[in-house]
A protein has these predicted regions:
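Active-site metal-binding motif and surrounding structural segment of the metallo-beta-lactamase
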Residues: 1-33, 185-204, 213-220
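Active-site environment of divalent metal-dependent phosphoester hydrolases
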Residues: 7-13, 40-43, 78-80, 98, ...
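C-terminal regulatory/interaction regions
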Residues: 173, 180-182, 189, 209-213, ...
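Long, well-ordered mid-to-C-terminal structural blocks that present hydrophobic/aromatic surfaces
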Residues: 155-208
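Short secondary-structure boundary segments
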Residues: 223
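Flexible, acidic/histidine-containing loops and adjacent segments that form or flank the divalent-metal
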Residues: 22-163, 251-291
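Conserved phosphate-coordination/catalytic loops
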Residues: 142-149, 201, 231-235
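Alpha-helical scaffold elements adjacent to nucleotide-binding pockets in ATP/GTP-utilizing enzyme cores
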Residues: 13-18, 53-56, 60, 237-240
C-alpha cells in the first residue's frame, strides 16, 4: 500500500521519483495506491515514456493501473476502514466535505486549462495587429501566485559591452513605472542588447507601453511550452514585441527560445502562422543553449 497524503511539495518529491522509475522500468508501484489529490500533482519530464512536463500524477497512475492492475483509490475520507493482510486501517481525516472541495477545485482548474487552450487556438486565428490591443491585467496581490510573480527580481545586467534586461516573472507595470521614474521614455528609451521576456512569454507580463520605452531587437523567451495549467509563450506577447507603436519595423527582431519550437508548440500551443516571420520582419532561433 502506498498513500499520498496530500499535494504539498515536501510530501510528493519521493513519490514522483518512484512513479517515474516504475514507468521507466515497467514494474508495479504497489498493489494499492491511495491518492485523493493526484490531479494536482505535476509529473516531471520522463525520458522513456515521453511524458510532458505538466502531466498530472493521475494520468501516470492510470498508466500503471492499466499495465499492472494496481488498485487506485481517490475517494478516501474519514470513517473508511479496511483490513489488509498486514494491518487494519481506519481513516480519520479528511472530512468528506473537504475531499469534495478538492474534487471541485480540480474540476475547476481542468476547465481553466481547457479555456486557456481554446484561447490560444482562437488567438491563432487573429492577426498580430489585432492582438496588440490586449492590455495586461493588474496583478491580484491577494493571490499567492500573482504576489510571488509581482515580487520577482528584475534587473539590468551590464558586462563589458553587453547589456541585458532580465525580467524574471515580474509584471510590466512595476518595471515601466521604475524606468519612467529614472527618466526613460518613448523619446529616451532604455537601450539594451537583449531582453529576457517575463514569465515565459505570458500575456499578462509584457505590455506595449513597457516595450515602447525599451530599444531592443533581441528577445529571449525561456519556456518548454507550459504545463497543465498554462501555455507559453502567448501569441499576444509575440504580438506586443512585434507591433508595439515604437518598434522600428525596418530592424529585424530576433526571438530566442531555449527549446525547439516544435516541442514548445506540442507542450503548449502554436503561436505563429505561416508567413508571419517575413510579414513582420522577425526570425526564430530555437533550442538555443548559449548566445
Amino acid at each position: 500500500l502506498m498513500v499520498l497524503t496530500h499535494y504539498d511539495d515536501d510530501h510528493i518529491g519521493g513519490i514522483l521519483q518512484l512513479v517515474g522509475t516504475c514507468l521507466d522500468d515497467n514494474v508495479a508501484l504497489a498493489k494499492e495506491v491511495w491518492a485523493n489529490c493526484a490531479g494536482y500533482v505535476e509529473m516531471a519530464e520522463n525520458k522513456s515514456t515521453n511524458a510532458k512536463q505538466g502531466v498530472t500524477l493521475s494520468v501516470k497512475l492510470n498508466e500503471l493501473k492499466e499495465k499492472h492492475e494496481i488498485i487506485w483509490r481517490d475517494d478516501l475520507s474519514e470513517g473508511f476502514k479496511t483490513n489488509l493482510p498486514f494491518a487494519s486501517i481506519e481513516v480519520v481525516s479528511p472530512p468528506e466535505t473537504i475531499r469534495r472541495m478538492v474534487i471541485k477545485k480540480q474540476e475547476e482548474e481542468g476547465q481553466q486549462l481547457l479555456k486557456a487552450s481554446q484561447m490560444n487556438i482562437d488567438n491563432l486565428k487573429k492577426s498580430i495587429t489585432e492582438l496588440t490591443e490586449y492590455i495586461p491585467k493588474e496583478p491580484d496581490l491577494n493571490k499567492d501566485a500573482e504576489l510571488a510573480n509581482a515580487s520577482s527580481i528584475a534587473l539590468i545586467l551590464k558586462c563589458d559591452d553587453l547589456s541585458i534586461l532580465m525580467l524574471g516573472d515580474c509584471y510590466p507595470q512595476n518595471v515601466e513605472r521604475y524606468l519612467r521614474e529614472k527618466g526613460y521614455s518613448e523619446d529616451n528609451p532604455l537601450v539594451v542588447d537583449f531582453v529576457k521576456v517575463s514569465h515565459h512569454g505570458s500575456r499578462n507580463n509584457t505590455s506595449n507601453s513597457l516595450l515602447d520605452i525599451i530599444r531592443c531587437d533581441k528577445f529571449i523567451i525561456s519556456t518548454n511550452g507550459g504545463n497543465c495549467r498554462s501555455n507559453h509563450p502567448d501569441r499576444i506577447t509575440i504580438a506586443h514585441i512585434l507591433c508595439h507603436e515604437k518598434r522600428n519595423k525596418d530592424r529585424k527582431v530576433h526571438l530566442y527560445f531555449n527549446h525547439k519550437k516544435e516541442l514548445i508548440e506540442a507542450n503548449g500551443a502554436p503561436f505563429l502562422n505561416a508567413g508571419e516571420c517575413k510579414e513582420w520582419n522577425f526570425e526564430i532561433h530555437d533550442n538555443i543553449t548559449e548566445l
